[in-house]
Regions:
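Structured, hydrophobic secondary-structure cores that serve as assembly/anchoring elements
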Residues: 1-180
Length: 181
């Protein structure tokens, strides 16, 4: 699966949304919250994965219709945008860098009480705030145990550092590098 692949590679992060049937066309937000939590409870713990809470309703200009689309692509895009406007060690969430674009509404808009259940369960809520837009309101990786690596920005920073160190270290190969030499 993708989480195992990311764990083996150690240079990527996987962004995962819940199943469409868990949130789209379900009228009761309590049921949606339970469905989302149950789906992600079955997935492995990893700092190389990021879970979000659902789907956005947007216009598909290629087919001239509105449709629900998973938010995992948006969350990956927020990380890419964070790289452009700040640095990988900044959080992609919040009102400054976490604005989801192109969304008309959310299939599941978690309440404060639901967010308080989802976030400790490793799920980053995406929330529509009236007059303020739709925002990624979390910064968690899918790591189950408390650690610095249970934050998206910390995992992304270490991926960047590991690549930079590997690049710099290859130039020290075959150089004098011990006490004798």
């Amino acid at each position: 699966n993708l989480i195992d692949l990311a764990e083996k590679r150690k240079d990527v992060v996987v962004f995962i949304s819940p199943r469409r049937a868990d949130v789209v066309n379900i009228a009761n937000s309590t049921t949606q919250a339970a469905n989302v939590k149950n789906f992600f409870d079955g997935l492995a713990s990893s700092s190389y994965a990021v879970f979000d809470s659902g789907y956005k309703f947007m216009f598909d200009k290629f087919n001239d219709v509105f449709r629900f689309v998973p938010l995992n692509g948006d969350i990956a895009g927020l990380c890419a945008n964070t790289d452009q406007v700040a640095d990988p060690f900044f959080s992609p969430g919040g009102f400054n860098r976490g604005q989801v674009r192109g969304a008309v509404k959310l299939a599941f808009n978690p309440t404060k009480a639901q967010r308080d259940i989802l976030y400790p369960a490793r799920i980053n809520p995406v929330v529509a705030f009236p007059g303020q837009g739709i925002v990624l309101f979390g910064d968690k990786t899918a790591l189950a145990k408390p650690s610095a690596f249970d934050r998206i920005n910390v995992r992304r920073l270490f991926i960047l550092l590991e690549k930079a160190i590997a690049t710099a270290a290859k130039f020290q190969l075959f150089e004098f590098n011990d006490e004798f030499t």
